[in-house]
Structure formats: structure tokens, C-alpha cells
UniProtKB/Swiss-Prot annotation:
Homodimer. Its main location: cytoplasm. CXXCXGXG motif repeats lie at residues 137-144, 153-160, 175-182, 189-196. This is Chaperone protein DnaJ. The keyword Zinc applies. It comes from Xylella fastidiosa (strain M12). GO terms for molecular function: ATP binding; heat shock protein binding; unfolded protein binding; zinc ion binding. Binds 2 Zn(2+) ions per monomer.
Length: 368
């Protein structure tokens, strides 16, 4: 399940200040705190989500990483390669016990965040991106040696690992003499300082499929950092972030929008034109339509990136109160309002009548 954007979780814009973040987190925590919602698993999950979002965005360094790389910045192996590889750790300890060879290493995975408009996410798009990465040093051809000469480590005999006997257990660990490289470099390369890799930028063309949503990731195999000593490079993970749209809100493969109509249109009925992502469509509003009524346009949502089925567009009617009335319009409305006097009001406005009856009943009980 894709993680929600941290800014959306807290309900703040990407330009939010520290104070804005703190206030948003307090609101969220008060709303979803387990003590206020005992036994509510959904509230508990929402509380944890808010806490996780605030912990990242309230930390300047973490926020900068998140703004650049998205959720991938905090997942194992993505965005720098400083986290230890658990496969290597367990391979070092248990490799000889179970007879397994040292696991093949590779370069670190890299995370990159790409922002899309809703239209781009729905239709798919190809983007050129430039990413910082580590590539093989061309000066020493990745050897790390200025003169190209390297010596086989005498401690591990080139394997990069040493065998340690502890009681009945035979363990394998990274060679402390060569740091696991298996070689000793006496004359380090002046360009890469013996690392065999240098920092660089590379430009890639990324095809983003139609239907992607916030948090979706695209994996580009072998486009991550170059591994040390010629081992294969890692992968590049491109995480999608979709900008808010002025008209549509997305919910999975469905889209939602509000359609404002005049009082006369809602009362008498009308045909209203609405925007969709592929043009315009018409909604036939029946007479006496109330504000909040939903109309569904089948197949006018988003084509799923996974199942290739299409979602729907839900249009919510909002009856708009007229403003900036002329004297004539005001007079006509006053005359119209007078027609609701007496018992006719209950017939024409049943919800208002029911509400007033409820208020009267409440006060009668309070005063009795």
C-alpha cells in the first residue's frame, strides 16, 4: 500500500513553516489520539501516520531529503548507501556455518522525486531527469590506483573476508586490513582518492505510465550508484508526487469535483456542462435537486495503472446563493419568499420544517 504524502497527511502546503507544522500536528494528534478513540484501529493508524509525517517534516535535514527524494529517502538502501546491507551482515556471520559464499554486492539504490500535474499522471508522460550519482572513475578505470597497480591483500588473500573460529562456530567477517576490497592500493588515484568512483550527474529519460498516483514508484534497474571495485550498480527508484488540482480530487481511480448551480437551476432542473479530463460532459439535473446530491459519470475517472479498468467521475452539486443582487432581483426574491408563508412552508421546505420542529421540541423539553 502506497504511503500518503506527508504534507497531505498533516494538511499543510509544502511551504509550511515550523509553526504551521506544529499546529497541524497538534490538531491531528488531538483528533486521532488513541485515548480519545479507544478501540478504533483506523484512528490509531491515522495517529501513527501523523506522528511519522511530523517527525520527518519537523527535522530540517529529513525534510530536505523528503522534498528531494520522497519516501524513498528513508527506505533501506535508497539515497546514499550509508545504511548497512543486512544480507552482508548476516552473510558475514553465518556464511561459513551454512556453507554459503559471500553474497554478491552492488551499488546503492538511489531515490528521486518527480512532481506531476494530475493530467500528466492520468495520461502518462516521459520526463528527463538529472540525478546525482557515483560513477566509475575514468582516470583509473575504477581500480582506485594512480598507476593501475593493486596488490592482493595478504590477510584475506583477495577474498575481502577473513575466517574467525569462535568455539564450535566458524564465522566469516569483512577483512579489517583491506576493508573488504581484497586489494591494497599503495598509490591511490589522485582523482577519486582510491575509491574507484567519483560523484557525477547523469540525465535519464523516464517513462511514467498512465494512471500513476501519489507514492507510486518506478524502478529503473541498474541506474543507481556504481558499485565499488566494478560490482554492478544499484537501482533508481522514481517516486511520483501529484500536485493538487484546482477542480478534481482523486480517490483511487475515481475523481470528485463540485459543480455550482443557481437556485433556479436546482429548483426547476437544467442541463449543466461539467469539465472532465478528456473534454466536457453534460449532467441532466432534475427539478428539486438538493445541494450535495452526487451524479456519477461512468468511465470518466482514471484508468488504473494496474488493472486497466477506468474509474468514475463523481460530481457533487453545490447550490450557490446569489450575491450582488440588483434592486429588482431582491424584490423578486422577497416576493418569492412571501409565498412560503403558513403551512405551505412545510410542503415546500420539508427539511427546514423538520429542523425547526426539532429545535422547538428540544426547547420544550429543556423548559418543562
Amino acid at each position: 500500500m502506497s504511503k500518503r504524502d506527508y504534507y497531505q497527511v498533516l494538511g499543510v502546503p509544502r511551504t509550511a513553516s515550523e509553526d504551521d507544522l506544529k499546529k497541524a500536528y497538534r490538531r491531528c494528534a488531538m483528533k486521532y489520539h488513541p485515548d480519545r478513540n479507544p478501540g478504533d484501529a483506523a484512528a490509531e493508524a491515522a495517529f501513527k501516520e501523523c506522528k511519522e509525517a511530523y517527525e520527518v517534516l519537523a527535522d530540517t535535514k529529513k525534510r530536505k531529503l523528503y522534498d528531494t527524494h520522497g519516501h524513498a529517502a528513508f527506505e533501506h538502501g535508497v539515497g546514499g548507501g550509508n545504511a548497512p546491507d543486512m544480507n552482508d551482515i548476516f552473510g558475514d556471520i553465518f556464511g561459513n556455518i551454512f556453507g554459503g559464499a559471500r553474497a554478491s554486492r552492488r551499488g546503492a539504490d538511489v531515490g528521486y522525486m518527480v512532481e506531476l500535474d494530475l493530467e500528466e499522471a492520468v495520461a502518462g508522460v516521459e520526463r528527463q531527469i538529472q540525478i546525482p550519482t557515483l560513477v566509475e572513475c575514468t582516470h583509473c578505470n575504477g581500480s582506485g590506483s594512480e598507476d593501475g597497480h593493486v596488490e592482493t591483500c595478504g590477510t584475506c588473500r583477495g577474498s575481502g573476508q577473513v575466517r574467525i573460529q569462535r568455539g564450535i562456530f566458524a564465522m566469516q567477517q569483512t577483512c579489517p586490513h583491506c576493508g573488504g576490497r581484497g586489494v591494497i592500493i599503495r598509490n591511490p588515484c589522485k582523482v577519486c582518492n582510491g575509491a574507484g568512483r567519483v560523484e557525477d550527474h547523469k540525465t535519464l529519460s523516464v517513462k511514467i505510465p498512465a494512471g500513476v498516483d501519489n507514492g507510486d514508484r518506478i524502478r529503473l534497474s541498474g541506474e543507481g550508484e556504481q558499485g565499488p571495485d566494478g560490482v554492478p550498480p544499484g537501482d533508481l527508484y522514481v517516486e511520483v508526487r501529484v500536485r493538487e488540482h484546482p477542480i478534481f480530487q482523486r480517490d483511487g481511480d475515481d475523481l470528485h469535483c463540485e459543480v455550482p448551480v443557481r437556485i433556479s437551476q436546482a429548483a426547476l432542473g437544467d442541463i449543466v456542462r461539467v469539465a472532465t479530463l478528456d473534454g466536457e460532459a453534460e449532467i441532466r439535473i432534475p427539478a428539486e435537486t438538493q445541494s450535495g446530491k452526487l451524479f456519477r459519470l461512468r468511465g470518466k475517472g482514471v484508468r488504473s495503472v494496474r488493472s486497466r479498468t477506468e474509474g468514475d467521475l463523481y460530481c457533487r452539486i453545490v447550490v450557490e446563493t446569489p450575491v450582488n443582487l440588483t434592486a429588482e432581483q431582491r424584490k423578486l426574491l422577497e416576493q418569492f419568499e412571501m409565498t412560503f408563508a403558513g403551512e405551505d412552508a412545510r410542503k415546500h421546505s420539508p427539511k427546514s420544517a423538520t429542523f425547526l420542529d426539532g429545535v422547538k421540541s428540544f426547547w420544550d423539553r429543556m423548559t418543562s
